[in-house]
A protein has these predicted regions:
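Short, charged N-terminal beta->alpha structural module
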Residues: 1-33
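Short active-site oxyanion
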Residues: 3-4, 44, 132-136
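A short mixed-secondary-structure module that forms the rim of ligand-binding clefts
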Residues: 36, 129-163
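Charged, gly/pro-rich active-site loop segments
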Residues: 42-43, 47-95, 168-239
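Generic beta-strand structural signal
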Residues: 49, 116, 130-131, 213
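Hydrophobic residues embedded in beta-strands of well-ordered beta-sheets
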Residues: 54, 121, 135-136, 218
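Short, basic/aromatic recognition patches
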Residues: 87-111
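A short, Trp-centered hydrophobic/proline-enriched beta-strand micro-motif
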Residues: 103-118, 154-158
Length: 239
């Protein structure tokens, strides 16, 4: 695991907190308590205070210095630094990773679906089903559709109850929600896969809406992968 040390001046600690949380796998030190032994750290970031705002220097052999203008710019910079400092470790072959993700989804049936627009966000627990390898939810509606209709962007998570780091298992997904026309063949196939006939559907007090989740990025965290020589965190980017 690549650990990053962040050394900060007291007047710039909020910038350090933002960097440390977004980058991840960081340890933060006030300047007066900076470690003398750097052998346990793959990277170092210093955050100093100046009259014009925080000054950030990132890297060991190759250093980059910049002055973030505001918290939004700090967050954006932290995301880029995180990608540079924390490249994928011991990745699985793509086909093997796809099979692992498929097996994980087949072994579960409930996800947490996050949608949002502007400063408004919503996270809803939902049962899901898979039809021809695609991921769907059926729902009577609700505020989650506010975000779906606004921008379609979704994030979803499927996970086991925590029982220790060795057995830790969860899947984060990012993608787009697509509303399925209730008059389409696709809608009919999803309803039938759920075990509901159209005649039964017509007798229900409220309509069932079908939404397809087109996933562009999977992030699998599976502690059991270490036994096979792979990193616990694996990423499958389809976007």
């Amino acid at each position: 695991m690549n650990i990053t040390a962040i050394i900060y001046d007291a007047d710039a600690r909020r910038t350090a907190y933002i960097l440390g949380t977004v980058i991840g796998n960081c340890k933060l030190f006030p300047a007066e308590r900076a470690p003398r032994d750097w052998s346990g750290y793959a990277n170092v970031i210093t955050v100093t205070a100046s009259e014009d705002g925080p000054v950030v220097t990132a890297g060991l052999q190759k250093r980059v210095t910049f002055r973030p203008k505001g918290e939004d710019e700090t967050v954006a910079a932290a995301e880029l630094i995180g990608k540079a400092f924390c490249p994928p470790e011991a990745p699985m072959p793509t086909d093997a990773l796809k099979a692992r993700i498929d097996a994980f989804l087949e072994a579960h049936n409930t996800l947490a679906l996050a949608t949002g627009c502007g400063k408004w966000v919503r996270c809803t627990p939902l049962e899901y089903l898979r039809v021809d390898g695609r991921l769907y939810i059926l729902t009577e509606g609700g505020l989650k559709f506010k975000g779906i209709w606004w921008n379609g962007a979704i994030s979803a998570a499927v996970f086991d109850s925590y029982a220790g780091m060795a057995s830790l298992a969860g899947l984060q997904m990012t993608g787009t929600a697509v509303y399925i026309d209730p008059l389409s063949d696709e809608y009919r196939s999803v309803i039938e896969a759920r075990g509901v006939q159209l005649q039964q559907l017509q007798q229900m007090p409220a309509m069932l809406h079908a939404v397809r989740l087109d996933i562009t990025r999977y992030e699998l965290l599976d502690g059991a992968l270490r036994a096979d020589g792979y990193a616990a965190r694996q990423v499958l980017d389809l976007g």
